[in-house]
């Protein structure tokens, strides 16, 4: 099985051509020349064999109107990659103008999974890599609701994956290094163990993920993005992928003992979906503590006794789903201590999602400013060149260079952004993405906002937001 793991964005082929290519020239002059000429790559003596090469995912998004076979597109992309002696870096790959087949059918080509190497300042050269191409189209159907009984709240929302609503969500989420890769690898291992027929009596795994942490850290978004990413990676194995977002509040009845029955009915519908072997189903239970409230609290009298039946029904139904190989349960919680210990014990991965680190805060704010520059809300040109804010690692490497003295240079402006990120310690990712809007609203002349003035306003806004959050 060829499974690889992920990273970054781009909206379409046009922006991909304008963006920095994710396949960048190798360090040598010969490799630089190779970027403009198709050639047969010649790996150096002693290069790794095919089995030892690093798997790197290449995600290929087709146009909504494309009717090309995935196999044909995959072969065309592989030929395109083989014809170029390049190093691999996360990001968009420009579609060659001399390939009418790809131009007509492909909206975007994206290199993924190299972030762990770039974090360690390593370069992946073409002869070290084995690309794994994933071809997909986005569903534009939107969410569907499963109506509850007697005009009550719908019991769940359903998405066909990969969905247009979640496109780019994975790349926009920034956490400590390794968290997203860990979740991807877990899911790949869980499906592999099932596919190979590993005896669950000897090796136990439940295909249950629990993300916990304070509100606003992106736990629910990460679950949706993970389901989207896995639906792309396993598209060749499962012809259909679905995300079922459970509305936990709809499962509580005003009638005594009815709540447990509602949980059983919901999971019966989910079981009908997973009975189709070609269907991969992700079940998302947000704020699972509302369902899995501790039975001990109910026994002590601080929780209604009906909650015992709800917890028992939830655990029983989850155990039933374990026998089906094509379902993964994703759960989130803001209050881990309120969850029944029997539920926590069933989760294979219990990952804490805390407030973003300094690096994550910087990259979140940088992505916001890049978007404002892209649409023209912020303006900045120095010497005819548009502003290019440095990545976190590039800034760390260049913070003592002479260009820091230039108040309009990229290094100086990136330093101001870094100062804002330092001030924002303790703020959630949700709050961080609001700051650029609040900063723009505080600028004296918002219709013509210079990047330098905006960054100073952003620092003031961050200080004000932090003081307000601390009371």
Curated annotation (Swiss-Prot):
Key word Cytoplasm present: no
Taxonomic lineage from the root: Eukaryota, Viridiplantae, Streptophyta, Embryophyta, Tracheophyta
GO molecular function, one term: ATP hydrolysis activity
Annotated residues for binding of ATP: 213-220
Name of this chain's protein: Pachytene checkpoint protein 2 homolog
InterPro entries according to UniProt: AAA+_ATPase (IPR003593), ATPase_AAA_core (IPR003959), ATPase_AAA_CS (IPR003960), ClpA/B (IPR001270), P-loop_NTPase (IPR027417), Pch2-like (IPR044539)
GO cellular component terms, semicolon-separated: chromosome; nucleus
GO biological process annotation, one example: reciprocal meiotic recombination
Family: Belongs to the AAA ATPase family. PCH2 subfamily.
Primary role: Plays a key role in chromosome recombination during meiosis.
Keyword ATP-binding: yes
Keyword set, alphabetical order: ATP-binding, Meiosis, Nucleotide-binding
